[in-house]
């Protein structure tokens, strides 16, 4: 094989990068479509799932603050999907924030929630409704890489859990995304008609 010049090397490298990005988009799109299918649900501890993601996503480059409700939060869920949703939210916060990320959880009556906050530029209220559409990225996202599918996948996963997503402003002025999940009523609780 003939020797590649330096320029060719750069070109090959950027082509490889493009291919990798295309593959990432295809993989995420398949995930996006797949999340619409029936998922086996089980009772699992939401805090344990959050803890796993925080441990996996924390490292020498990023530290994640946590404020998890004490004890377990038992929710009927597909744990792998919820883990994926939380991871996507954390990656989004890392991409657009300035280094501060906070993951918290809580519950009230018949629903539980988890939330991811960052200290990035935030998103204007009028843009928020588009945030979870595939391939839509906020203004501040234009300078960073990403498939534009991360939060669309989150939306699909939470929808499949009959949950709700709420967008707000974090305590540091960035973006806060809270996911609400229904908590099944246990036999010990009396349902009022």
Task: Give residue ranges: language-model regions.
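Short beta-strand/loop element within the Bergerat-fold HATPase_c
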Residues: 100-110
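Short conserved segment of the HATPase_c
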Residues: 123-135
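Conserved micro-motifs of the catalytic ATP-binding
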Residues: 35-39, 74-77
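Conserved glycine-rich
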Residues: 99, 162-163
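Acidic ATP/Mg2+-coordinating residue in the GHKL
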Residues: 118
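Short alpha-helical Gxxx[C/S/T] motif in the catalytic ATP-binding
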Residues: 150, 154
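Conserved catalytic submotifs in the C-terminal HATPase_c
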Residues: 63-74, 109
